[in-house]
Amino acid sequence: FIAGLHHQDIVWTTEFMFNALRARYTEQSLYKYYLHNTSVSRLNRQGNKNLNYQRHYIKITRLLEKLNRNYADKITIYPEFHQQITYEALRVCHAVRKEPDIITRQRMIAEIFTSGMYKRLITNVRSVKVGYQALLWSFRLWQWRDKTRSHHRITRSAFNLR
């Protein structure tokens, strides 16, 4: 496991499936999530807390893409494994839309472009429906970005770098 990374089950489950010799679907519930009011998944985040939380999903997209690359010569990488990367990237896009603070929104958009998640969003599309959503979001992000400064400069200011 990666220390400090939220939602590690996403990456863990994917790697588990890559290493499984056989897989079978069952209706039986093997475990239950207990979501309480103070759960990490249910917290309403705004501003820097939201930005930091979305960085986890950006990192998850990077890790999933790395897994797909590492296992490409060992197993068949089905379209669903690629599309999972796009789904996680779309989560970040929806968080951008919901962010009320305009400065934080610009930082999130800048990190999407700087981290390469923008490319992962598009290159891992494997269906028409998700392709439409990815193109729509890439157009929105391109329109919403801060056009007065480069995305690298905005990201550096998010990390308080000179």
What function would you assign to each model-found segment?
Residues 1-46:
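Conserved nucleotide-sugar donor-binding catalytic segment
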Residues 21, 25, 73-74, 100-101:
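Alpha-helical structural elements of signaling/regulatory helical domains
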Residues 95-162:
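Membrane-interface aromatic/basic loop that binds lipid-linked glycans or pyrophosphate carriers
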Residues 30-37, 43-72, 91, 98-118:
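Catalytic core of nucleotide-sugar-dependent glycosyltransferases
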